[in-house]
Structure formats: structure tokens, C-alpha cells
Curated annotation (Swiss-Prot):
P700 is a chlorophyll a/chlorophyll a' dimer, A0 is one or more chlorophyll a, A1 is one or both phylloquinones and FX is a shared 4Fe-4S iron-sulfur center. It comes from Euglena gracilis. The chain crosses the membrane at residues 46-69, 135-158, 175-199, 273-291, 330-353, 369-395, 417-439, 517-535, 575-596, 643-665, 707-727. Chlorophyll a B3 binds at M662, Y670. Its EC number is 1.97.1.12. Belongs to the PsaA/PsaB family. One of its GO terms (molecular function) is chlorophyll binding. This is Photosystem I P700 chlorophyll a apoprotein A2. GO terms for cellular component: chloroplast thylakoid membrane; photosystem I. It is a multi-pass membrane protein. It is found in: Plastid, Chloroplast thylakoid membrane. It catalyses: reduced [plastocyanin] + hnu + oxidized [2Fe-2S]-[ferredoxin] = oxidized [plastocyanin] + reduced [2Fe-2S]-[ferredoxin]. Phylloquinone binds at W671.
Length: 734
């Protein structure tokens, strides 16, 4: 007899109903719950899966390089990055009629193509790639690395080469390795690449393997390094008239602290970036020697944590016992990693446009919008995941005895104060922000716009002025040429910063007003509400007033009947589920704000944002409706254009999103009737009745239906906005 899915759970495999399929999928990655799972096995499976993920990442990036080299226009694009659209890949679609072939044939390519809005062209150009052969070489190298990663994953599952649990739990060695080897040496290698390849290429000097050892990146070579005359490497930087990619106006400096942007490319100075990575490398290589391993130097993390007690004694035992708790909980470690990664991803979104590192990226408007939105959504999903695994930690891994009196138990002890304060903040933000918006809408509707409540963000303007923004004329610190801070900035550090912050063509410290003040608080409401739901879900995961024994029910349970007052919404999973909706709301408001402000800036029409962003109808009419008009005319009875695919995706995204509500607003009886009706029809229809339905149809559980609904809501939401964003921006700016 064939083994039924899932192999990892004999109990589920023998289930005669469709529950077998859904629960099998739901628990396929929950290794801890699988039959015969040992701690040793668990760690090895996760370790091997890391190599699998690395292989997928390298294969994906290899594919990007390969398709651009094969079907792109990289060599043509670098001759005129501001006017030639970069091609991602060709389109070979048998459904295309002549109008579609003509609409999608662009960028001097003989057939239909997709335009690249990922920024890879700018990235590859900045780091010194110049020909299709360079791209092919990179692609083949990454393919080799992907193969190596797959082999490593397989190898480490073999008994002879599989590490023991003690190896995985050697936190000091792992941290030293990650800090020094992964962060430190990779940063050093990257600064080396920038100094030896990218900076010379930006000055018209072609460096490859054939002349790598003979072409000095600096005229003095390593002599200043060994003599301690390091400042020599910062002398004679590229001039303000430097033409990127040529020797015209080029200097010889390789490590600088200029600040601001290259006047032509509007990106950070490559020599500043190289300096940054070298400094990071030194810091991390030193940091990788902090913890005690085989040698009798450095600290034990356990000792550090146990010593962390407040002298006043008012904070209990502080971090006592945390080492064992964290080191023995994969969920705690994953939660910390996801929280860090979420913050970093959001910072990438912010810095990619405000301090753009890649040449000519900021002039590619659609790519800027796509990269910001992409990274903010990813940050949102990662952050919610951090809290989900925090909740699982409290249910599965938290030991009350081992953590008595320390910071973890104290947080649990006063969770009601934390939750109620967060609740108060969200209520305050919600009522006041919505109140201001609605008041302004009423004033607009009643024909008295002068009665709107418009609040200038004076504190934020003061902070911008302190950093050198001149437009507000507040004359404070860097915005006052008579201050000591101003003098220091000109003589000691970042002389280009003030030009950068006051440059109208970049997005560093944009001018803000009442519309920004309101949307800032709307976003703050979203952030605090999402946090409230996630924090409450994690802190109540073990038990709440209504359900003190909640931890015995696990991470996701459907209902425990009306006896406790109805418990359908209080599992930790439900908190995660609700938080994702709020997260999507928040990222929506954030990206709406970023996009609308920038398209008005880029069009020289900033007054539209300033006037219309102070009331809700302004957002609906002048941002959403106005910018979707071209999109929904991508195809109509008279024909189609190159926005047609985005118009179709806009529709498709709405449909997926709306399908989510069918799963979210329904009772279990509805699903039982629906599934039985579907099976009945399936078994009585020619052709489909050839396939026998062996499992008894059982309705989705409440938790399952919510998951399916949430997935459709999220995917549809992202698809809809992606289509809107790319189409509305590319229609205006290419």
C-alpha cells in the first residue's frame, strides 16, 4: 500500500477525511511536532534547510544575471542610463496579438520585453560590471555556489558529517564566527572589491583578473598603510565635475568622508561607501573576538547576562538565567533574528531613496518607488513573524522556574500595564488623527476650507534644521553658518552633507507641512495598533484572565466552547492573524504617503500633496483615483497599451483580495455544505469523475479558513498595490 501524505505524522496519514491534507500542509514545517523527532534531528534538519535556502537565493540571483546578459540591454544602458529603459527579459507569449507586440517592443529591442524595475542595472553598474560577459561570469559563479550549497545541505544530513547538538548550542563560537567571519570578513571583502574594481571603473580604469595584481587602486599602493600615513588615502577625491565611468574630473582617493552625493549620479560617493565597509569590517572583526571559546580570553555570555542586575535592586534579577533560556529555544532565537531583520529591511527601504548608494538610481522614479514599497512590505511580514515565534517560545519553551524574577517573568507579571498603556496610545492616536482628518473633510465639504485645522510639524522641522535644512530659516546648529557645528562640518567631517540635504533633486530630509503631520500620526496609529495586537498575543500566549491554562492548548486552537465566555479569538495564532491586517494597513498608509509625496515632487507639483493630503477625500480623489485612471485604461474597447498587463493585474489583485472575505466572513456549516456540494458535482461530471475522491470531505476549521482568507487578503492586497504603483509611476516617468 502506498504511503499516504504526510509521512511525518502517522496519526494524520490515517485520518480518513480531508483534514489529513490541510493539517499535513499546516504542520509540514513544524519539525518539533513530527513523529520520532529528536533534538539532534531537529537541529540538523534546520541546519540543512539553511543551505537549501542559500541555494535558492543564489539560483535566483544567478537567473537575474543570466537573463539580463542573454535578453537584456546592459551594454546599451550603461552608455545612457538616464534615457534608455533597462530590460529585465524578453516576453515570448503566444497570446500576444500585433497591438501587444508593438506596445511591449521598446528600449531598441527587436521584440516584446519587460522593463526592469528592480535596480539591478544600477547596482551592477556601480560595482564595476560593464559587459554581458561580466554578467555571464557572475551568473555561472553564483550557479556554482548554489550547487555547492545544495551539496553542503545534503552532506550535513549524512550521519558521518552531521554536527551534534552541542555544536549548535556553542553560542560563543557561533557568535564569534558570525561576527568576525560572516559580517567582518564579508564587509572587508566588499570594501576590497569597491577599492580594487568599482572605484577604478568609476574613473574609467578597467580592472579584471588579467590586470588585478598589476593595477594599483591607489598610486602609493600599500606604503601609506604600513607607514601609518592613512590620511593619504583620503586626499584628492573625485571632483564635483567628475563624469562617472570616465577619467574626467577623477581623483585618486579610495577612502573618504565627504558626505552628500556625487553631483552627476546623485548617489553616495563610492569612496565614502568603501570607507564605511572598511570601518564596519574592523568593528566586526574585533567584535568577533569578544566571547570566550577555546582560548582563555574574552567573556562568557552567561556571565555577562547574569551580571546584568540593576544596582538599585528594583528590576529584580535582570538578565539572570536568560542564556540557558535563549540558547535552548530555537523560537526565541528566531524571534530575535526576525525582529532584527525586520528593522534592517525597513531601514533599507528608507536609505535606498534618501541616501541612494547606486549610480543614477534616484533618477529612475519607478524603480525607486518599487524598491521602497517592496522592502517595507517585506519588513512588515518579517516583523509579525518575530512576534509569532515569540508567542510560540512562551508556549513551548518558557520555563517559569528557571526564569523566576528575571526580566522575562517580570514582563509577564506586569503585562496588563504594558497592554493597557499601548491600548491608551492607540485610542489617543486613532481618535485624534481621525478627528482631525474628518473635521477637515467636513470643512471642505461645507465650502469653508480656511476652517481646517492645519498643524505645522514644528518639532520635526526644528530637527531637520538642526541637521542643516535651510528652507525653514530656523537658523539652528548646521542650518546656521555662524554655529560651531557648521564650522566643524565644513572642516572636519562630511563637507558634502549640507549640499546633499538642501539638494532639491534628491529625497534627503524632504520639506514637511500639515499633511505630513497628519499622515505621520496615522502611520503611528497603525504601528502602535499592530504592536498592541502582537505584544498582547505573545504575552497572553501562556494564559489570560479568561483562559489561564491557555498554554496547554498550543499556539492555534479554534474554540474551547462558550463555558469560558467564548474563546474563538484568543489563541496566539489569532493575534498574529489580526496583526497581519493591521500591518498591511500600516504599510499601505506608509507607501501611499511616500509615493504621493514623491510623484508630486518629481512632477514639480508639490502643492497638490500639500493641499489635498490634509483630508481623507483628498487622498481618495487626488492620489488613488487620479493615479489609477491611466491604469484602468490599459485596455478598453478601443485597444490596449503597455499598461495593459498592470491593468489586468490590478483587476486580478482585487479579485484575489475580495476572495479572502469569503473565507473570513463565514461559518463552519457553510464550508461543510460547500465542500460536499463540490464533491457531489465532481463525482457526477464526465471526465472529473474518473478521479475518485478517497477522503471524506470535512469543512475547513475556523483557524484554517482564517488562514486561507488571510493569505488571499495579503496576496491580493500586495498584487493590487504593486500594479497600481508601477503603472501609475511608469506612465508618468517611464
Amino acid at each position: 500500500m502506498a504511503t499516504k501524505f504526510p509521512k511525518f505524522s502517522q496519526g494524520l496519514a490515517q485520518d480518513p477525511t480531508t483534514r489529513r491534507i490541510w493539517f499535513g500542509i499546516a504542520t509540514s514545517h513544524d519539525f518539533e511536532s513530527h513523529d520520532g523527532m529528536t533534538e539532534n534531528n531537529l537541529y540538523q534538519k534546520i541546519f540543512a534547510s539553511h543551505f537549501g535556502q542559500l541555494a535558492i537565493i543564489f539560483l535566483w540571483t544567478s537567473g537575474n544575471l543570466f537573463h539580463v546578459a542573454w535578453q537584456g540591454n546592459f551594454e546599451q544602458w550603461i552608455k545612457d542610463p538616464l534615457h534608455i529603459r533597462p530590460i529585465a527579459h524578453a516576453i515570448s507569449d503566444p497570446h500576444f496579438g500585433q497591438p501587444a507586440i508593438e506596445a511591449f517592443t521598446r528600449s531598441q529591442f527587436p521584440g516584446p520585453v519587460n522593463i526592469a524595475y528592480s535596480g539591478v542595472y544600477q547596482w551592477w553598474y556601480t560595482i564595476g560590471l560593464r559587459t554581458n560577459v561580466d554578467l555571464y561570469n557572475g551568473s555561472m559563479f553564483l550557479l556554482f555556489i548554489a550547487t555547492l550549497a545544495l551539496f553542503a545541505g545534503w552532506l550535513h544530513l549524512e550521519p558521518k558529517y552531521s554536527p551534534k547538538v552541542s555544536w549548535f548550542k556553542d553560542a560563543e563560537s557561533r557568535l564569534n564566527h558570525h561576527l568576525s567571519a560572516l559580517f567582518g570578513l564579508s564587509s572587508l571583502a566588499w570594501s576590497g572589491h569597491l577599492i580594487h574594481v568599482a572605484i577604478p571603473e568609476s574613473r574609467g580604469i578597467h580592472v579584471r583578473w588579467d590586470n588585478f595584481l598589476s593595477q594599483l587602486p591607489h598610486p602609493s599602493g600599500l606604503e601609506p598603510f604600513f607607514k601609518g600615513n592613512w590620511s593619504l588615502y583620503s586626499e584628492n577625491p573625485d571632483s564635483l565635475t567628475h563624469v562617472f565611468g570616465t577619467a574626467s574630473g577623477a581623483g585618486t582617493a579610495v577612502l573618504t568622508f565627504l558626505g552628500g552625493f556625487h553631483p552627476e549620479t546623485k548617489s553616495l560617493w563610492l569612496t565614502d561607501i568603501a570607507h564605511h565597509h572598511l570601518a564596519i569590517a574592523v568593528l566586526f572583526i574585533v567584535a568577533g573576538h569578544m566571547y570566550r571559546t577555546n582560548f582563555a580570553i574574552g567573556h562568557r555570555i552567561d556571565d555577562i547576562l547574569n551580571a546584568h542586575k540593576a544596582p538599585s535592586g528594583k528590576l529584580g534579577l535582570g538578565h539572570f538565567g536568560l542564556y540557558e533560556t535563549i540558547n535552548n529555544s530555537l523560537h526565541f532565537q528566531l524571534g530575535l533574528a526576525l525582529a532584527s531583520l525586520g528593522v534592517i529591511t525597513s531601514l533599507v527601504a528608507q536609505h535606498m531613496y534618501s541616501l541612494s548608494p547606486y549610480a543614477f538610481l534616484i533618477q529612475d522614479r519607478t524603480t525607486m518607488a518599487a524598491l521602497y514599497t517592496h522592502h517595507q512590505y517585506i519588513a512588515g511580514f518579517i516583523m509579525t513573524g518575530a512576534f509569532a515565534h515569540g508567542a510560540i517560545f512562551f508556549i513551548r519553551d518558557f520555563d517559569e522556574e528557571k526564569n523566576k524574577g528575571n526580566v522575562l517573568s517580570r514582563i509577564l507579571d506586569h503585562k496588563e500595564a504594558i497592554i493597557s498603556h499601548l491600548s491608551w496610545v492607540t485610542l489617543f492616536l486613532g481618535f485624534h488623527t481621525l478627528g482631525l482628518y474628518v473635521h477637515n473633510d467636513v470643512m471642505q465639504a461645507f465650502g469653508t476650507p480656511e476652517k481646517q485645522i492645519l498643524i505645522e510639524p514644528v518639532f520635526a522641522q526644528w530637527i531637520q534644521s538642526a541637521h542643516g535644512k535651510n528652507i525653514y530659516e530656523l537658523n539652528i546648529l548646521l542650518s546656521s553658518d555662524s554655529s560651531n557645528a557648521f564650522s566643524a562640518s565644513q572642516a572636519i567631517w562630511l563637507p558634502g552633507w549640507l549640499n546633499g540635504i538642501n539638494d532639491k533633486s534628491t529625497s534627503l530630509f524632504l520639506q514637511i507641512g500639515p499633511g505630513d503631520f497628519l499622515v505621520h500620526h496615522a502611520i503611528a496609529l497603525g504601528l502602535h495598533t499592530t504592536t498592541l495586537i502582537l505584544v498582547k498575543g505573545a504575552l497572553d500566549a501562556r494564559g489570560s484572565r479568561l483562559m489561564p491554562d491557555k498554554k496547554d492548548f498550543g499556539y492555534s486552537f479554534p474554540c474551547d466552547g462558550p463555558g469560558r465566555g467564548g474563546t474563538c479569538d484568543i489563541s496566539a495564532w489569532d493575534a498574529f492573524y489580526l496583526a497581519v491586517f493591521w500591518m498591511l494597513n500600516t504599510i499601505g498608509w506608509t507607501t501611499f504617503y511616500w509615493h504621493w509625496k514623491h510623484i508630486t515632487l518629481w512632477q514639480g507639483n508639490v502643492g497638490q500633496f500639500n493641499e489635498s493630503s490634509t483630508y481623507l477625500m483628498g487622498w481618495l480623489r487626488d492620489y488613488l483615483w487620479l493615479n489609477s485612471s491611466q491604469l484602468i485604461n490599459g485596455y478598453n474597447p478601443f485597444g490596449m497599451n503597455s499598461l495593459a498587463v498592470w491593468g489586468w493585474m490590478f483587476l486580478f489583485g482585487h479579485l484575489v483580495w475580495a476572495t479572502g472575505f469569503m473565507f473570513l466572513i463565514s461559518w463552519r456549516g457553510y464550508w461543510q455544505e460547500l465542500i460536499e456540494t463540490l464533491v457531489w458535482a465532481h463525482e457526477r461530471t464526465p471526465i472529473t469523475n474518473v478521479f475518485k475522491w478517497t477522503d471524506k470531505p470535512v469543512a475547513l476549521s475556523i483557524v484554517q479558513a482564517r488562514l486561507v482568507g488571510l493569505a488571499h487578503f495579503s496576496v491580493g492586497y500586495v498584487f493590487t498595490y504593486a500594479a497600481f504603483l508601477i503603472a501609475s509611476t511608469s506612465a508618468k516617468f517611464g
